[in-house]
């Protein structure tokens, strides 16, 4: 009874991401030099005030107008991820999983990526032009929820990272050690400690299972 009550009251939150996967001719050429261009991933934002404004917009269900960016061009470190001489780029930002004006992310995703996310990246790079982009695929809250059952409502962290859902309390009090109430059934994934985006939950759960089996 207590376990079911905790499950029903678990909060996944209302924050998702808008993510675009690019196939590129060239890796992004950042204006502040080769060292940045050869770094595998970047965090891009204007100011702390801009970040505050973005979270206010997310709370209000508004698509962020001047978002910070997370970009990763893993092919600068691992060329095998793309055909010879080509590159890939992932770029995303936090957004509300549902828009307060009734629009669907699936309907506005191309416009938002082109006119907000890409335009922001172009402020910091010299070559993120139309001729450099070979193709793209865009993930939204809807596609994330459809493709991965752990991403409930398109939220990517496996549940809110509030104090009541962190550390010893993730996912529930007394259940932070990857055991479920059912014997020999274990829990893993982003809803378990340490949470989505940090990884290692599968490895930790596997080690717990091996320890229980006497290995």
Predicted region positions:
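Flavin-binding catalytic cores
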Residues: 27-28, 59-65, 106-149
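A glycine-rich dinucleotide-binding beta-alpha-beta segment and adjacent secondary-structure elements
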Residues: 65-72, 127-193
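Short, glycine/acidic-enriched capping/hinge loops at junctions between secondary-structure elements
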Residues: 33, 102, 198-199
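Short low-complexity stretches enriched in small and charged residues
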Residues: 41-51, 114-115, 140-146, 158-160
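Mid-domain catalytic core of redox enzymes
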Residues: 1-82
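A generic secondary-structure boundary signal that marks alpha-helix termini
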Residues: 100, 126, 211-214
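Amphipathic alpha-helix from the class-I
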Residues: 96-104
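C-terminal structured subdomain/cap of oxidoreductase catalytic cores
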Residues: 1-2, 8-11, 17-29, 86-88, ...
